[in-house]
Amino acid sequence: MLTRRTFAVALIAALAVPTLAAAQATTPSAATIERQLEAAPRVKLRPNQRVTIREFKRRPDLRRMARSIDIQSINFAFGSAAISESQYGKIENIADALQRILRRDPGARVLIEGHTDAVGSFRSNQILSEQRAASLKRTLVREFGVPGYALETVGYGEEFLLVQTQNENWRNRRVTLRRFDDFIR
């Protein structure tokens, strides 16, 4: 039999679930993605300060200076890098933004960073994050016609958690799009 207290707790929990689901499902619009990646560069490197793509991927200090946006709404099955067609509507926003940017600036380059939460081994999370970033690139190129030359991928596993926890947290399972053409030789 439900007491008032039990009912109140159950009601609060039930009301919180749709909010959490809505937060997870929120996808930035193409205009928002475009605006973030087209914002004025935070820093302008001199030509002799520019680095290789490989070095850029290894330098958190440079990546933090690059224009970026976190995408937390692409849902992957647990332990999987496959992107189902049900996610294509979300990915279409990314594709539209990238295509508009590339029409204006064919030299634009975007790094797709894969991130995981801390559940599982460090190695398996590293591999999974790399596979998810590659899967998103493949989908953008094959399904939406984004030129592959404009995209690079990297996985960081659980290295850059947004929420510092060893437990499962959806905010840590994300893709970050980072504009890097201002940083490379």
For the regions a protein language model found, what residue spans apply to each?
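N-terminal targeting leaders that direct proteins to extracytoplasmic destinations
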Residues: L2-R67
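Periplasmic peptidoglycan-binding/anchoring modules of Gram-negative envelope and division proteins
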Residues: S80-E113, V141-R142, L177, R185
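A generic secondary-structure boundary signal that marks alpha-helix termini
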Residues: A16-T19, R100-R103, G145
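Short, solvent-exposed beta-strand/turn patches at coil↔beta or beta↔helix junctions
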Residues: R46-R50, R54-R58, L62-A97, D117-R123
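Charged, low-complexity, helix/coiled-coil-prone segments
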Residues: A25-V43, D70-Q87, W170-V175
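Extracytoplasmic
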Residues: A66-I71, S86, N93, D105-G107, ...
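Periplasmic OmpA-like peptidoglycan-binding domain that tethers envelope proteins to the cell wall
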Residues: H115-R185
